């Protein structure tokens, strides 16, 4: 049966699958037409002998036991055989060889027709002998029922055959290129460890072509030696031999090498560095014209003239860069463009002063003119009034300029533009005038009044105008001879009932307005819009006093005298002196007695001791206080009222809420106490005085009567306000009569006898004790 190629087998298998389905895969996978082992694949790729089986493998693997499958019946046409994968076995064998020996085990080469034709004739007799040896005498009857499994084998050829079969590479002529290529190949194979390998000629040749023989390697080394010499003879890692110097003591000190960059000095004293072109003692033939003076650039240093000529050269060429001085002492370097003794025709204008940039130095002016003229500075220097230097364009006054005399001697506010230098003399003209109004207010600025040097503005000089006053008081005094009365103040000042100054538009009574007389001398509640000076001018002393008394006094710093523990000042505690004598707003915690004792004449306004000494005026009382006087003063200082007393000192506030004739709480709610009203408001005989005859009023119409509706100008029975029975009934916060409630049950404290108090101190100092034991606050 003829052997089929892989392509023909694939076509047959596909045809069988299309006709018989998957059942034909067993018959198609029969290995009778395709028998390939691992031993015949390697020669196929290398020797191109595809159809010839090898006679004997180079390395024989142990043969595994044969597994035979016996069919159930001899007549069965289907046989199950294990599938073989020779390609897979070849790949596994190749990978195993590469993992063991690296790339040297890879013997695959590119096949061509010449190699196949050359190896076909040699492989034919070998295949025939192999077939004869395989004949066992059974005629091949047992081959159908037995499957022989053999391990893949790999035939290894000698290294010499593989090297001889490879084409001989051409030697690299450029050693640098060979070194670079060898390094790159070594880095690609071995990584960074390849850089530590020696770089000798043999190593370079071996890395370039690993298949070189010893003879070829020696030829490559000789070729590199002929081109590069013996510099690569030693290895890179070798070191030079070291040891004691046998002739070290006999060796002389090494002479200093000549400086590459020398330093020399010119005839003018300047230092020049670079390559020295001077004359040397060790060189002959350059003695001519050494000490002669030449024109142009001097290449010889001053030390050459001092060594060989014993004198300094005379400079015949002028300096290329000269240094001159200006009239102000500044140094200027560059080309000198002044007058020269060797040039004629430049004498005119030598000693004349010019404006602009100064091109002539002060040295030439002193040489040809005898003295140098100082020109004007372009950048001036001055000092401020505080002594700080200022440079720049000077904007001050100059004696050569007229018209800048105005305001030269005045001190201005803001940035200082003039220095502290003395100003030149000139005509002082006032740029900013000073004047005064008729009311005495000073005004500064440009004067727009009448002047004696201007005609035509005499009309209306002495007339009075309304509005803003543009004419000063000096003009009126100079041209009119009399000073008119000033206009009314635009912003008035008034005094309130508490002696505070208020400025603004005045809304009080005026003598030039009629109809605002009613209510001038009446005390009003609320915010007063008319100042206290109106009452003083138009009303009597009693009316002013009534207005002052009518003004409510709010709680302030100097409160009433208090008993008990007071957080005041002047005690045994230190550190409370700061701010003790200053007026504060809010609840007063310091009594007037403590404030007067601690502060004295420094007490805030509103206290009795304001502006007075605490002990009074001198020689007004005894220096020694009697016991009776001390007891009276103690009774005055420590009254029977605890807390703040607003109106009277004989009322007790605090826990004594059920004492007879005692008022609890705020005393301003006394209108609900009927007993207090009957005792306080007893009918008295009023003294009726005949009213004086009032002058006839000039006001007619509405407001002609003395009664004014609206604001409470008159405290009458027909006017409602904030006090009286009607106010008490209208205010729901104040309790009314108790007729609609349950009768009040008297408590037991009113029936018991009051004990005599034996507690002194902060209990109120009353002669009767308290029956309350739980409420707290009765006893300190």
UniProtKB/Swiss-Prot annotation:
Span list, region Middle region: 260-608
Induction annotation: Down-regulated with rising temperature (from 25 to 28 degrees Celsius) in both nitrate- and urea-grown cells (at protein level).
Bias type Basic and acidic residues, positions: 1-15, 86-116, 709-720
N-repeat repeats: 5-24, 86-105, 175-194, 213-235
Keyword flag Repeat: yes
Compositionally biased residues, Low complexity: 48-78, 117-130, 264-276, 387-403, 432-444
GO molecular function terms listed in the Swiss-Prot or TrEMBL record: structural constituent of carboxysome shell
Sequence ranges of the C-repeat repeats: 623-669, 693-726
Repeat region (M-repeat), residues: 260-309, 320-369, 378-417, 431-480, 490-535, 541-599
Region called Disordered, residue ranges: 1-173, 189-212, 226-281, 330-349, 382-444, 631-661, 686-780
Keyword Magnesium attributed: no
Region called C-terminal peptide, residue ranges: 750-780
PTM per Swiss-Prot/TrEMBL: Unlike H.neapolitanus and predictions for P.marinus strain MIT 9313, this protein is not thought to have ribosomal frameshifting.
Pfam families tied to this protein: CsoS2_M (PF12288)
Role description: Required for alpha-carboxysome (Cb) assembly, mediates interaction between RuBisCO and the carboxysome shell. The protein is probably intrinsically disordered. The C-terminal repeats act as the encapsulation signal to target proteins to the Cb; they are necessary and sufficient to target both CsoS2 and foreign proteins to the Cb. The N-terminal repeats of this protein bind simultaneously to both subunits of RuBisCO.
Assembly behavior: Interacts via its N-terminal repeats with RuBisCO. Interacts with the major shell protein CsoS1.
Domain-related comment: Has 3 domains; the N-terminal domain has 4 short repeats and binds RuBisCO. The central region has 6 longer repeats. The C-terminal domain has 2 repeats and a highly conserved C-terminal peptide. The C-repeats serve as the encapsulation signal for the alpha-carboxysome, and are able to target foreign proteins to this organelle.
Annotated protein name in UniProt: Carboxysome assembly protein CsoS2
Organism, as annotated: Parasynechococcus marenigrum (strain WH8102)
């Amino acid at each position: 049966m003829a052997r089929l190629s892989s392509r023909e087998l694939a076509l047959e298998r596909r045809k069988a699958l299309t006709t018989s389905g998957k059942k034909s895969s067993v018959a198609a996978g029969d290995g009778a037409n395709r028998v390939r082992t691992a031993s015949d694949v390697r020669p196929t790729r290398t020797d191109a002998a595809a159809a010839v089986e090898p006679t004997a493998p180079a390395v024989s693997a142990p043969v595994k036991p044969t597994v035979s499958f016996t069919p159930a019946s001899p007549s069965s046409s289907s046989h199950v055989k294990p599938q073989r994968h020779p390609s897979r076995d070849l790949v596994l064998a190749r990978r195993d060889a590469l993992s063991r020996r690296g790339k040297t085990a890879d013997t695959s080469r590119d096949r061509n027709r010449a190699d196949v034709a050359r190896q076909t004739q040699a492989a034919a007799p070998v295949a025939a002998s192999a077939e004869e040896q395989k004949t066992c005498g059974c005629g091949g009857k047992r081959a159908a029922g037995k499957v022989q499994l053999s391990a893949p084998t790999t035939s290894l050829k000698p290294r010499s055959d593989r090297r001889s079969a490879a084409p001989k590479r051409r030697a690299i002529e450029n050693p640098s290129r060979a070194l670079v290529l060898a390094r790159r190949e070594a880095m690609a194979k071995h990584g960074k460890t390849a850089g530590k390998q020696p770089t000798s000629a043999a190593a370079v040749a071996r890395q370039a072509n690993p298949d070189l023989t010893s003879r070829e390697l020696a030829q490559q080394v000789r070729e590199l030696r002929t081109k590069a010499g013996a510099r690569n003879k030693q290895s890179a890692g070798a070191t030079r031999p070291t040891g004691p110097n046998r002739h070290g003591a006999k060796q002389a000190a090494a002479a200093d090498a000549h400086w590459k960059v020398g330093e020399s000095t010119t005839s003018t004293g300047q230092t020049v560095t670079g390559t020295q072109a001077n004359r040397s003692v060790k060189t002959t033939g350059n003695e001519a014209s050494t000490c002669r003076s030449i024109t142009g650039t001097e290449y010889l240093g001053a030390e050459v003239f001092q060594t060989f000529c014993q004198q300094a050269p005379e400079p015949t060429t002028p300096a290329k860069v000269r240094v001159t001085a200006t009239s102000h002492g500044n140094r200027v370097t560059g080309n000198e463009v002044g007058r020269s003794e060797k040039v004629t025709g430049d004498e005119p204008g030598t000693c004349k002063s010019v404006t602009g940039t100064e091109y002539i130095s002060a040295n030439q002016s002193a040489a040809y003119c005898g003295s140098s003229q100082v020109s004007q500075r372009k950048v001036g220097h001055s000092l401020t009034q505080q002594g700080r230097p200022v440079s720049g364009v000077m904007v001050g006054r100059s004696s050569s300029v007229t018209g800048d005399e105005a305001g030269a001697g005045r001190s201005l506010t803001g940035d200082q533009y003039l220095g502290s230098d003395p100003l030149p003399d000139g005509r002082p003209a006032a740029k900013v005038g000073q004047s005064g109004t008729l009311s005495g207010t000073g005004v500064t600025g440009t004067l727009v009044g009448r002047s004696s040097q201007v005609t035509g503005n005499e009309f209306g000089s002495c007339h009075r105008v309304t509005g803003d006053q543009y004419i000063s008081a000096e003009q009126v005094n100079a041209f009119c001879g009399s000073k008119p009365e000033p206009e009314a103040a635009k912003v008035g000042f008034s005094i309130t009932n508490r002696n505070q100054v208020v400025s603004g538009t005045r809304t009080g009574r005026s003598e030039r307005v009629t109809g605002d007389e009613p209510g001038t001398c009446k005390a009003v509640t609320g915010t007063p819009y008319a100042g206290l000076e109106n009452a003083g001018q138009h009303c009597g002393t009693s009316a002013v006093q009534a207005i002052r008394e009518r003004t409510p006094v709010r709680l302030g710093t100097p409160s009433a005298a208090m008993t008990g523990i007071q957080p005041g000042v002047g005690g045994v505690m230190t550190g409370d002196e700061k701010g003790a004598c200053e007026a504060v707003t809010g609840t007063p915690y310091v009594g007037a007695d403590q404030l007067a004792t601690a502060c004295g004449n420094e007490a805030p306004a509103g206290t009795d001791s304001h502006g007075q000494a605490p002990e009074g005026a001198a020689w007004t009382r005894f220096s020694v206080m009697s016991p009776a006087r001390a007891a009276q003063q103690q009774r005055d200082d420590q009254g029977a009222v605890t807390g703040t007393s607003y109106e009277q000192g004989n009322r007790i506030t605090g826990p004594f809420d059920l004492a007879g004739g005692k008022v609890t709480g705020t005393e301003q709610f006394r209108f609900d106490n009927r007993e207090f009203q009957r005792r306080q408001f007893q009918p008295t005989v009023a003294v009726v005085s005949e009213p004086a005859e009032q002058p006839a009023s000039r006001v007619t119409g509405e407001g002609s009567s003395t009664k004014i509706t609206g604001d409470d100008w008159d405290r009458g029975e027909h006017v409602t306000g904030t006090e009286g029975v009607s106010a008490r009934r209208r205010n729901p916060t104040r309790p009314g009569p108790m007729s609609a409630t349950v009768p009040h049950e008297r408590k037991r404290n009113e029936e018991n006898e009051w004990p005599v108090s034996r507690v002194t101190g902060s209990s109120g100092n009353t002669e009767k004790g308290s029956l309350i034991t739980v409420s707290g606050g009765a006893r300190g």
